[in-house]
């Protein structure tokens, strides 16, 4: 078994022992099993899911995954279980980021608002994908 912890600045969002975990690494989705080699990797907004069950995953923002043979610690700005994503909230974040991006002057401002918009868009898409009641 593999222990997985997902941690945000607000605290621990998930802690459980699983057989496998899939994470949204920058180079693509990464599947991790017990006895994985040591690795520290950057993650991007996407879905973390366990034991090949993507319906019960957790949407995460930017962060890092610290992988050891028996543990995965995901440190991320934001993490929300798929069923708890507030679609309206993330639509507002997306709209605000789009407005702010058009007014951004510095490379730092552009990068900040691009990241916020990408994370909001990813959370919106995850919510729509896993909730058939939500229309695109």
UniProtKB/Swiss-Prot annotation:
List localization entries: Cell inner membrane
Where would one find the signal peptide in this protein? none
Q: Which Pfam families match?
A: ATP-synt_DE_N (PF02823)
The UniProt keywords, alphabetically, are: ATP synthesis, Cell inner membrane, Cell membrane, CF(1), Hydrogen ion transport, Ion transport, Membrane, Transport
A single Gene Ontology CC annotation of this entry is: proton-transporting ATP synthase complex
Report the PANTHER family cross-referenced here. ATP SYNTHASE DELTA/EPSILON CHAIN, ATP SYNTHASE EPSILON CHAIN, CHLOROPLASTIC
Q: What is the protein's known function?
A: Produces ATP from ADP in the presence of a proton gradient across the membrane.
Query: What's the name of the protein?
Result: ATP synthase epsilon chain
The gene from which this protein is expressed is atpC
